[in-house]
Amino acid sequence: MSESEHQNVGRSPLGFAGPLSLSMPSFDFWYSSTFWLYLFLGLWFHRYFRLLVHCVSHWTYKSKPIPSKPTFTSKDVTVVIPTIHNAFEELRPSLESILACEPAELILVTTHDKRKELQKLADSLVFPKVRVLDTPIANKRLQVCEALPKVETPITIMADDDVTWPSTLMPWILAPFEDPEIGGVGTCQRVRREHDGSWSTKAWNWLGAAYIERRNFEISATHNIDGGTSCMSGRTGAYRSEILSSHDFLHGFKNEKWRKWILNADDDNFVTRWLVSHQWKTWIQYEKECEIETTLENSTKFLYQCSRWARSNWRSNWTSMVTERYIWKQQLWCTYALHFATFTSLAFLIDPLLLASCWWGTADWDMQNRRYAFWSQFVFMFAFTKVVKLMGLFIRNPTDVMFLPVSVVFGYFHGLVKLYALITLNMTSWGSRADGDANDEQRLAPAPQPSIVLKTPPGKGSLIRYNARQKGRQTQAQQVSWEKSDYASYDSSTSYVPIRVHTPMATTPIDTKLYTNESSNTCWAI
């Protein structure tokens, strides 16, 4: 082979091999220790940089202090609790803890068939103002919407029927509202611990407690950085009544769409996104005096709860990042650390890949340093990253350390739960409670189709455009004039509203449902 032929080996006839060879790594690079080292560093930064930042942010988090002269007191608060419980007497301890905080009113909302039983419980409570409402079906969004228009106080607290409040909660949860830009306030939470029962019951109970503890860690950290969170918990949250009682909110709350369906699940996610899209700030009061207690399943039913939460996260985070996109400008760190992490945090894939890339990436090192690097990563992964978010649990109950291996194993299994939730996004059932799925088909109902006269025809145009008098294209001046005029619109919360449309197209319809206004060159859809 001549020297010129040897130089041309591997080159394309068009001479593109040169630029490609400069811009792309060689084939051997993908199997080299350098590639694995780069991969390790990239994965490590993505997985642990936000954790280290969150550690500092969480440890330095400060709740809003109680003002000496508060703008709002407990008498400015109405508590709304939707419930479909089968044994209302079991709600008494929770309701009494809430009434001990002395709100102005407590509104309970259930279904038609359960109203009498709930009314008996309400009448037995020693409190001057407890109101019971009902809806035709069991659906949290519809039940909440039944109560919100009847709220007469400036602050509304929405709560679940199984939470227990400390008597000190009210002044702490109201303190952030001294800032007029704050629209919603959440609390820290803990799970009611089971100290009796079998070891498996205690283990499931601890997994639920660990889930809530991690959530406390994350939302306090992100709020301290940019005031963001992926979801304000529906277990207990305080909001300005002007937000929740507005027509736009109520309509959107009852008519949220997920793909081609009306979504009546994920209510707390909707409220959170609504606050963000309307430039309201949120806050979390991370104080013992503002810590509510809740209950989770202490058996395999906990897996149903995890899958339901995971579906909500997939749906809501996709809506936040892709459909609405307000978070990109308002909560950039939260977008990266919480929303984007939903799509990338699969520990059962990332952790083994981190250890493997650490080992293969240090292949050129001497064996002693190579082992030191590997075991340093191993200890950091399992002794720090798997523990730091749970320190609150271990401080309160040091014996919980025995459940740490259970937490690690479940963390890997939870990645599979997330993938299962991803491929079953259209499921909205609770699965974990017998009374939770009475009207499950209403949680994801087909969205109503618009009238045929309102549909956009095939083609590049976005509206049907008619012009009865002018047979040619409108002039530019006419188009500008039209753009400056008012439009009538269609409101899905009402019946048919005339839609005023114009067109530069030379089309004259023949339709008995269309009335042409000859004087204004417009057409009205009736």
Swiss-Prot record:
InterPro entries: Glycosyltrans_GT2/GT47, Nucleotide-diphossugar_trans. Pfam families: Glyco_tranf_2_3 (PF13641). It is a multi-pass membrane protein. It comes from the Eukaryota. GO terms for molecular function: glycosyltransferase activity. Induction: Expression is induced during hyphal growth. Its EC number is 2.4.1.-. Its main location: membrane. It is found in: Cell membrane; Secreted, Cell wall. Glycans are attached at N298, N317, N426, N517. Disruption phenotype: Severely impairs hyphal growth and pathogenicity on wheat leaves. Does not affect adhesion to leaf surfaces. Leads to constitutive overexpression of several transmembrane and secreted proteins, including an important LysM-domain chitin-binding virulence effector, LysM. The keyword Protease does not apply. Disulfide bonds: none annotated. One of its GO terms (biological process) is hyphal growth. It is an enzyme of class 2 (transferase). Keywords: Cell membrane, Cell wall, Glycoprotein, Glycosyltransferase, Membrane, Secreted, Transferase, Transmembrane, Transmembrane helix, Virulence. Coiled coil: none annotated. The keyword Transferase applies. PANTHER family: EXOSTOSIN-LIKE 2, SYNTHASE CPS1, PUTATIVE (AFU_ORTHOLOGUE AFUA_7G02500)-RELATED. Belongs to the GT2 glycosyltransferase family. Glycosyltransferase involved in the maintenance of the outermost surface of the fungal cell wall. Likely functions in the synthesis of a currently unknown, potentially minor but widespread, extracellular or outer cell wall polysaccharide which plays a key role in facilitating many interactions between plants and fungi by enabling hyphal growth on solid matrices. This is Type 2 glycosyltransferase. It comes from Gibberella zeae (strain ATCC MYA-4620 / CBS 123657 / FGSC 9075 / NRRL 31084 / PH-1) (Wheat head blight fungus). The gene is GT2.
